[in-house]
Amino acid sequence: MTISEKKHTVGRLKSRPQFLAVREGEKRRGGFFLLEVLDRKEPDSQARVGFTVTKKHGNAVERNRMRRRLKEAVRLHAGFAMQPGHDYVVVARRDVLDASFQELAAELKSRVETRPKHRRSGDGRPRNV
């Protein structure tokens, strides 16, 4: 790699306040996970990612396996698509264990690349008049 080439790396979310801040952002639902995204309004800083697997999804061995699969999918396929200055939290669902790695990586990449939908001034639901 030459000096002019920029290595695109993804940082990590480590503390509870960082994870809680991302919960206030956009949520992108998928079959294998929920992706929470927060724009930090700092375009010069690198993207950061964190992983959450709740205890209802099995014992520690299974939860760690889910986390490892998601980390590897981000490293190989989705990390380059993450926008600088954004924080991402991947909340795993049980189906992460049963999905093929190609399906998992494709869905993760798709969710990361999805752009937010702009809503009209209303909440989008019809009113009863």
From Swiss-Prot:
InterPro entries: Ribosomal_Su5_D2-typ_SF, Ribsml_uS5_D2-typ_fold_subgr, RNase_P. GO terms for cellular component: ribonuclease P complex. Its EC number is 3.1.26.5. Residues 109-129 are annotated as: Disordered. It catalyses: Endonucleolytic cleavage of RNA, removing 5'-extranucleotides from tRNA precursor. Keywords: Endonuclease, Hydrolase, Nuclease, RNA-binding, tRNA processing. The keyword Membrane does not apply. One of its GO terms (biological process) is tRNA 5'-leader removal. It is an enzyme of class 3 (hydrolase). The keyword Disulfide bond does not apply. GO terms for molecular function: 3'-tRNA processing endoribonuclease activity; ribonuclease P activity; tRNA binding. It comes from the Bacteria. Pfam families: Ribonuclease_P. NCBIfam families: rnpA (TIGR00188). RNaseP catalyzes the removal of the 5'-leader sequence from pre-tRNA to produce the mature 5'-terminus. It can also cleave other RNA substrates such as 4.5S RNA. The protein component plays an auxiliary but essential role in vivo by binding to the 5'-leader sequence and broadening the substrate specificity of the ribozyme. Belongs to the RnpA family. Consists of a catalytic RNA component (M1 or rnpB) and a protein subunit. PANTHER family: RIBONUCLEASE P PROTEIN COMPONENT. This is Ribonuclease P protein component. It comes from Rhizobium johnstonii (strain DSM 114642 / LMG 32736 / 3841) (Rhizobium leguminosarum bv. viciae). The gene is rnpA.
